[in-house]
Curated annotation (Swiss-Prot):
Domain of life according to the entry: Bacteria
Species whose genome carries this gene: Rhizobium johnstonii (strain DSM 114642 / LMG 32736 / 3841)
Main location: membrane
Name the UniProt record assigns to this protein: UPF0391 membrane protein pRL90066
UniProt keyword Cell membrane, yes or no: yes
Chain ranges passing through the membrane: 5-25, 28-48
Family: Belongs to the UPF0391 family.
UniProt subcellular location: Cell membrane
Amino acid sequence: MLYYALVFLVVALIAGVLGFGGIAGASASIAQVLFFIFLVLFVVSLVMRLMRKV
């Protein structure tokens, strides 16, 4: 449990540095692009799995 608390602390510190450092705008647009890429890949893999079952 303590391990997860430390992991979340490190993630929060990194997010705070990026948020207050001015990189937030660039990283938000990159995250948005990555979200849509992985969403498309998820849908494609889901369709391929359904096609394989039939």
